[in-house]
UniProtKB/Swiss-Prot annotation:
This is 5-hydroxytryptamine receptor 4. Changing W272A: Abolished G-protein coupled receptor activity. Changing D100A: Abolished G-protein coupled receptor activity. It holds the Pfam family 7tm_1. It comes from the Eukaryota. Disulfide bonds join C93-C184. It is found in: Cell membrane; Endosome membrane.
């Protein structure tokens, strides 16, 4: 999402030392975002087992959106910020701004879809997940992640709907008389600010909060069920030791999953909430938010594109192993039988009258999906959702 006022530098501009430090920082952010998202895409394309997992379609599409942000949006913003001038012309300014809004919104939409996918997988019965997340529905969700943002990016920006009523102010801020420089200024009127913020952030944010809250509640209820089973079987000497170990592992898994949810939502809010709160407030206070504040909030949102590979892929054991194999040139030390397709034990529990299968893969941090089969004695073996 582009800044509303591109005139972000002070009147004196940056000194030589400040420029070097700033350029180093911005280059590091861009490079990490490019490499991280590329690695995620290569891992899924390279490993057949990862391609079988439904959630990974969203992960790859998210990585592609974030990769485009880091290639098509961030570098031009960094150049303008460091050089304190826009040198690419007015038409490309509109194109870059439209790409900025399109790609960052698409990235946020993908995060929302991942949360909904995990909600159906963890909080609903297996057959519900299979019926909800069909290949057609996944394709429609992915298409929506890319098509819907065009209605708040290229369409209104190219038509100039965002600057109706504030054209004079925009023209004034495009030119810096002190440095004789021009800027790529993107400012929005009140209707566009509200519409864009609600569609691009507040609705996805609300859906993510609701989905992850339900996942958290389900995980806690599942852990409570296991704890009750432990207490009930504590007095029985016939209780197998392996069952105790498995229950303990499950509780640790659920605790880790809950912590991961907090990390995911915390990073998302930290990165994007400041920008979108300011995005709505600024038009109502006569555009008095300092340019430096806009720059800080904007790049905080960009950093989210570099964090997503770590949150949604690097925390997953299967992805990590694939990364090691790719980076170490297919080193045999990182291979093992059924390397990324091992069967993950699951436990079942009854919550609110419904039997659920909560995968051990919840510990994998936000992505959670895995090839997973309940114990052979479980009545849900036949109902287990397929990842193919």
């Amino acid at each position: 999402m582009d800044k509303l006022d591109a005139n972000v530098s002070s009147e004196e501009g940056f000194g030589s030392v400040e420029k070097v430090v700033l350029l180093t920082f911005l280059s590091t952010v861009i490079l990490m975002a490019i490499l991280g998202n590329l690695l995620v895409m290569v891992a899924v394309c390279w490993d057949r087992q990862l391609r079988k997992i439904k959630t990974n379609y969203f992960i790859v599409s998210l990585a592609f959106a974030d990769l485009l942000v880091s290639v098509l949006v961030m570098p031009f913003g960094a150049i303008e910020l460091v050089q304190d001038i826009w040198i690419y012309g007015e038409v490309f300014c509109l194109v870059r701004t439209s790409l900025d809004v399109l790609l960052t919104t698409a990235s946020i939409f993908h995060l929302c879809c991942i949360s909904l996918d995990r909600y159906y997988a963890i909080c609903c019965q297996p057959l519900v997940y299979r019926n909800k997340m069909t290949p057609l529905r996944i394709a429609l969700m992915l298409g929506g992640c890319w098509v819907i943002p065009t209605f708040i990016s290229f369409l209104p920006i190219m038509q100039g709907w965002n600057n109706i009523g504030i054209i004079d102010l925009i023209e004034k801020r495009k030119f810096n008389q002190n440095s004789n420089s021009t800027y790529c200024v993107f400012m929005v009127n009140k209707p566009y600010a509200i519409t864009c913020s609600v569609v691009a952030f507040y609705i996805p944010f609300l859906l993510m909060v609701l989905a992850y809250y339900r996942i958290y509640v389900t995980a806690k209820e599942h852990a409570h069920q296991i704890q009750m089973l432990q207490r009930a079987g504590a007095s029985s000497e016939s209780r197998p030791q392996s069952a105790d170990q498995h229950s303990t592992h499950r509780m640790r898994t659920e605790t880790k999953a809950a912590k991961t949810l907090c990390i995911i939502m915390g990073c998302f809010c930290l990165c994007w909430a400041p920008f979108f709160v300011t995005n709505i407030v600024d038009p109502f206070i006569d555009y008095t938010v300092p340019g430096q504040v806009w720059t800080a909030f904007l790049w905080l949102g960009y950093i989210n594109s570099g964090l997503n590979p770590f949150l949604y892929a690097f925390l997953n054991k299967s992805f990590r192993r694939a990364f090691l194999i790719i980076l170490c040139c297919d080193d045999e030390r990182y291979r093992r039988p059924s390397i990324l397709g091992q069967t993950v034990p699951c436990s079942t529990t009854t919550i609110n009258g419904s039997t659920h299968v909560l995968r051990d893969a919840v510990e994998c941090g936000g992505q959670w999906e895995s090839q997973c089969h309940p114990p052979a004695t479980s009545p849900l073996v036949a109902a287990q959702p397929s990842d193919t």
